[in-house]
């Protein structure tokens, strides 16, 4: 693959390809055409071919795609061929829900620590990982091989905690705090606003009702 910039739109579609290909594997499907894959994913076949051509193509004329091979290769592109140790800061409802999501570990995201300020949660184990207090966070991060930190904390604390994590070697932050984090360019940040998708759904409902007179 050429060393060139891949658009965020293409990268954003890769997890969908990976997920659908995993479903096909589970169903025992060995190969699939771009046309059949497009029907399943509700994108055009040409879009699929263009996306995959960014990484070398993977398909054969008249054969389509080998599902297992394509699944494996997209997994490599997404970095899922090696484990990623992660911690969650904030063990409230959202933090615990993330910790309980077993598919993360299936894809190589290994939960190593949970942290919170609520002393009543200290020692409570989520899938075998005990909740620790925030005053342990700095030492834990500096002494552990942690790659990703998920923030499920109030936005008023997000910058302070993010800066401390960066000072202690964290280079990737999955941010669920209700604010966008603007951090140094060498820090990888994925800002997630759960309400955004709900607002898009609300917009679609409103347009549908207007178009159909409801």
Show which residues each predicted segment covers:
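HTH-adjacent hinge/linker in prokaryotic transcriptional regulators
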Residues: 31, 35, 40-83
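Extreme N-terminal segment that seeds HTH/winged-HTH DNA-binding domains in transcriptional regulators
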Residues: 1-30
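Glycine-rich Rossmann-fold phosphate-binding loop(s) that bind the pyrophosphate
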Residues: 91-92
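NAD(P)-binding Rossmann-fold cofactor-contacting core
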Residues: 105-127
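Phosphate-bearing ligand-interacting subdomains
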Residues: 22-25, 128-214
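N-terminal Rossmann-fold NAD(P) dinucleotide-binding loop
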Residues: 95
């Amino acid at each position: 693959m050429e060393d060139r910039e891949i658009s965020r739109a293409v990268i954003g579609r890769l997890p969908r390809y990976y997920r659908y290909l995993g479903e096909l594997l589970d169903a025992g499907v060995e190969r699939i055409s771009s046309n059949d894959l497009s029907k399943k994913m509700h994108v055009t076949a040409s879009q699929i071919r263009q996306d995959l051509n960014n990484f070398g193509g993977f398909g054969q004329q008249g054969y389509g795609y080998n599902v297992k091979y394509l699944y494996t290769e997209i997994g490599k592109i997404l970095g899922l061929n090696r484990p990623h140790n992660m911690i969650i800061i904030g063990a409230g409802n959202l933090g615990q829900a993330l910790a309980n999501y077993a598919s993360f570990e299936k894809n190589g995201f290994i939960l190593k620590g949970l942290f919170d300020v609520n002393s009543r949660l200290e020692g409570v184990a989520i899938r075998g990982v005990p909740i620790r207090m925030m005053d342990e966070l700095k030492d834990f991060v500096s002494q552990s091989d942690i790659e990703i930190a998920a923030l499920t904390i109030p936005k008023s604390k997000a910058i302070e905690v993010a800066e401390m994590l960066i000072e202690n070697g964290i280079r990737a932050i999955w941010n669920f705090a209700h604010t966008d984090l603007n951090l140094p360019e060498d820090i990888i940040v994925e800002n997630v606003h759960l309400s955004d998708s709900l607002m898009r759904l609300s917009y679609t409902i409103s347009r549908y009702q207007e178009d159909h007179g409801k």
